[in-house]
Amino acid sequence: MDHSPWQRCLSVLQEELPAQQFSMWIRPLQCVINDNVMTLYAPNRFVLDWVRDKYVNRINELLTINESNNPLLLRFDVGSKPTIDNSVTNSPVSRNTGGNESLFAKATSAPKVAEPESNIPKKTNVRLNYTFENFVEGKSNQLARAAASQVADNPGTAYNPLFIYGGTGLGKTHLLHAVGNGILLNKPNAKIAYMHSERFVQDMVRALQNNAMEKFKQYYRSVDALLIDDIQFFAGKERTQEEFFHTFNALLEGNQQVILTSDRYPKEINGVDDRLKSRFGWGLTLAIEPPELETRVAILKRKAQESQINLADEVAFFIAKRLRSNVRELEGALNRVIANANFTGRAITIDFVREALRDLLALQDKLVTIDNIQRTVAEYYKIKIADLLSKRRNRSVARPRQIAMALSKELTNHSLPEIGDAFGGRDHTTVLHACRKVKSLREETHDIKEDYSNLIRTLSS
């Protein structure tokens, strides 16, 4: 059977879709064509449902256009393609190889080597208590969690490298350890190295001092998965970047998994060599955003349950509405509430929480105000605050105004009418429309999603 129908679809979709969307949703699909039925196999139910929801119409259109003389029936399934003659894999050319075709080539397994001295991690230092099961999933981290899960199931083949970025305390480190635990669950003898980027720097410095660079290289290039947190700390360390560049290449050539995290998008990391930043984007790059209200409530309820505390819904919502910046802050606040309750023997009510977190809540209220949001958005988009309050409707002003309204709804306790009044006396329906519009744009447009995340980080810092 001719496999060109799916290859033609892939070529068009790769041109039409942003690289991140193509890598996340289309590239993992495997195709089998039998008796005019094209079956696309997704690696899991999450990917299958997403492709059906977002891309099935376009795929059918392409099949109709390209195969008008030989119509194909499209169906989906979860799993791997059968190993039969008429199967076909996705093999579009990577946009970012830069002519280095060998980067993704199959390589023979690296020979086992002696590990360096005790300053180098041993078999693994993955934290067993950070798993996918206790990672609270929401819209803000759904894609990153799904990609990390796929990597754990298929290390070295699904999204390599995986680059996860976002503000402090949003769950990036949790996902790194969850991947490590997932890999070890399937392959107990796998060699997993997790570390903060500064540990890599320290290991290299010690290796240089002890004339042990060869041992250092052997260890880091023999791991099955290298998980490095806060890669932005490589900035300005040219010797470290040079060594990591070669380590990175060696791992990918050997189909060994690399996962990196950062507090910002790869191209925004100053002080890191451009060729490294380019390689960071070779696989899949995903953001973790501050958790939305429902996820914050779920995190609080889960944490309370782990502490054998029955946290009432109204109390969880009260805390979640007042503390919005990150998971770490939420958990720290809850620990403080629980400790106060244990010391005093009092029940955890809204009044008790208000008392226990008095200084924290007061600080939060001072930090995020509509005035502060307007000033921050105006500076970010290089417009005047007066423009946000004006009746001007051109996009260069209207879009920042909508974003500022959406941020005001998310980050303050003001009502829609109050927000509208603060933006030049607008009606509450205008604010509601702005919030819905920005939500839609964040799902569809990478630039808007980036802008919104950057603004939240600025306002929450």
Curated annotation (Swiss-Prot):
Record's keyword terms, sorted: ATP-binding, Cytoplasm, DNA replication, DNA-binding, Lipid-binding, Nucleotide-binding
Q: Does the keyword Lipoprotein apply?
A: no
Q: Where does ATP bind?
A: G169, G171, K172, T173
One GO cellular component term, please give it. Answer: cytoplasm
What's an example GO BP annotation here?
Answer: regulation of DNA replication
Look up the domain of life of the source: Bacteria
Q: Where does the record place the region Domain III, AAA+ region?
A: 125-341
* Gene Ontology molecular functions: ATP binding; ATP hydrolysis activity; DNA replication origin binding; lipid binding
Gene3D superfamilies assigned to the protein according to its UniProt record, in alphabetical order: 1.10.1750.10, 1.10.8.60, 3.30.300.180, P-loop containing nucleotide triphosphate hydrolases
Principal subcellular localisation of the protein: cytoplasm
Q: Where is this region: Domain I, interacts with DnaA modulators?
A: 1-83
Q: Where is this region: Domain IV, binds dsDNA?
A: 342-461
Q: Where in the cell is it found?
A: Cytoplasm
Check the record and name the HAMAP family matching this protein: DnaA_bact
Homology family: Belongs to the DnaA family.
Q: How does it assemble?
A: Oligomerizes as a right-handed, spiral filament on DNA at oriC.
**Primary role:** Plays an essential role in the initiation and regulation of chromosomal replication. ATP-DnaA binds to the origin of replication (oriC) to initiate formation of the DNA replication initiation complex once per cell cycle. Binds the DnaA box (a 9 base pair repeat at the origin) and separates the double-stranded (ds)DNA. Forms a right-handed helical filament on oriC DNA; dsDNA binds to the exterior of the filament while single-stranded (ss)DNA is stabiized in the filament's interior.
**Annotated domain remarks:** Domain I is involved in oligomerization and binding regulators, domain II is flexibile and of varying length in different bacteria, domain III forms the AAA+ region, while domain IV binds dsDNA.
Its protein name is: Chromosomal replication initiator protein DnaA
Which gene is the coding source of this polypeptide chain? dnaA
